[in-house]
Amino acid sequence: MTTSTIEQKDENEPLLATADQVSALIESFIELGVLVHDNQGTQQSHTALTHKTNQVISQLSGLTSSPFTHQFPIPVDVISYIEDGRNPDIYTREFIEVTAKSNARLKGKMKAFARLRDVLGEKLGNEFPRLVDSIDDIKKRTTPEE
């Protein structure tokens, strides 16, 4: 049901258990939707619908009372995506794209300021030769190590 996989490690066991509970809950919701859609109004369909509704309630209760559930906070934006019927993986992809663009913009600014520092330092060194040592010290302290 999910598009990503969680690596089987000891520290991931709570996350795997929660993911399994959520997957089972999603399946129950799908089955409940089918039962509601195909409801014929008979006693048998009413009993099946009641049973499935009670199953969903118990699964929700189990998920809520699980000690692992509160370990993994879910962003409100993801919940909004799900409520709007959208795929939460789209939120993740869009978030990564926005972050990548922001990082690229910041990298460009850093390069521009580094170039400004170098050009300004060179011009100041040409005009004020006695400041060359201070300018070189500033350049050395403000140049990131790679």
Swiss-Prot record:
One of the Pfam families matching this protein, by short name:
Med10
**GO cellular-component term (any):** mediator complex
Query: Which InterPro entries does UniProt cross-reference here?
Result: Mediator_Med10 (IPR019145)
Give the residue spans that cross the bilayer. none
Instruction: Give the record's GO biological process terms.
Output: regulation of transcription by RNA polymerase II
Localisation: Nucleus
Please provide the record's keywords in A-Z order.
Activator, Nucleus, Transcription, Transcription regulation
Lineage, top-rank taxon, reads Eukaryota
Q: Tell me one GO molecular function of this protein.
A: transcription coregulator activity
Chain coiled-coil ranges: none
Q: Identify its protein family.
A: Belongs to the Mediator complex subunit 10 family.
Q: How does it assemble?
A: Component of the Mediator complex.
Functionally, this protein is described as follows: Component of the Mediator complex, a coactivator involved in the regulated transcription of nearly all RNA polymerase II-dependent genes. Mediator functions as a bridge to convey information from gene-specific regulatory proteins to the basal RNA polymerase II transcription machinery. Mediator is recruited to promoters by direct interactions with regulatory proteins and serves as a scaffold for the assembly of a functional preinitiation complex with RNA polymerase II and the general transcription factors.
Protein name from the UniProt record:
Mediator of RNA polymerase II transcription subunit 10
* Gene source species: Scheffersomyces stipitis (strain ATCC 58785 / CBS 6054 / NBRC 10063 / NRRL Y-11545)
